Amino acid sequence: MNIDLINWISFAWQALLKNRDWMTWNLFLAVLPWALSLWLFGKPRSRWLRWGVVSLTVATFIPHASHALQSSLYILKYIKTSYLIWAIALTAVLMGFDRWKLKGARSRSLLWWLGFLVFIAFLPNAPYVLTDIIHLVEDIRFYDSIWLITLILIPQYLIFMGLGFQAYVLSLMRLGTYLETRGWKRFVVPAEFIVCALSAIGIYMGRFRRFNSWDLVTQPDRVVAITMDDLASQRPFWVTIVTFAVITGLYFLMKWVTESIGLAQQSRSMAVLSNK
């Protein structure tokens, strides 16, 4: 009996390790915009939250540091002139609008806008983790142990997808909070819908066309051309619409849950202070 248990634990551990590499990499890509939001939109009050985000980002990055370095070198080697022109032009337009809107006061720097473009480019990687459920289906078909599937694989995937999508929710919520502090509260909901729409397009292009975020740098012309061509086709268009509906619905649901938890914690803290 003990030998069987040890063998099962060893088998379960191997099943966990089988998904470790791609899960940690996808989770790093999902958490990266959240980490960027700490710099772009201001530090959160909770020190534990700040350290938690940084720790999770570092923990998911370290196993893939060499891969990330190779990707960075690839981008630098094959970066397109058209992308540089497009990025500089877009950044200049955004900075000009920012200075005009704020009359030069508290306007953001070039570095900030470049960071914001990276934030938007990588943000679709967070809800993208929901599509990794196809790997769970493959694992269920591969393994014949109901206990392994129920006790190990399903919890592993739920934690992975939950962390990734919650990173998306918190990143977008921080963007909304930032807009509110700048006096642009009326733009929060439209911005959320726009980001969800861009994320839906990014998810489709990533899952079906196998593009990734750095393809926007190395082959922007091809990405734009194929995206426009696909959106003009019926099947890709409706797949994108359904994806948009799913991630938008889940986002607002999880936003409500997150805000409710935050309000409950504030009420509890105020109650404790009033009793002292």
Segments and roles (model prediction):
Residues 113-124, 191-209:
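Hydrophobic alpha-helical membrane-insertion segments
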Residues 26-42, 54-64, 83-100, 173:
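Central hydrophobic cores of alpha-helical transmembrane segments in multi-pass inner-membrane proteins
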Residues 201-223:
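Juxtamembrane non-transmembrane "cap" segments at the membrane-aqueous interface
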Residues 40-51, 99-111, 177-186:
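Membrane-interface helix-boundary motifs at transmembrane edges
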Residues 57-69, 116-133:
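A generic, lipid-embedded transmembrane alpha helix
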Residues 5-30, 75-84:
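Hydrophobic transmembrane alpha-helical segments in integral membrane proteins
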Residues 15-24, 151-153, 212, 222-249:
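Membrane-interface transmembrane-helix boundary segments in multi-pass integral membrane proteins
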Residues 31-42, 95-99, 162-179, 244-266:
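Transmembrane alpha-helical segments in integral membrane proteins
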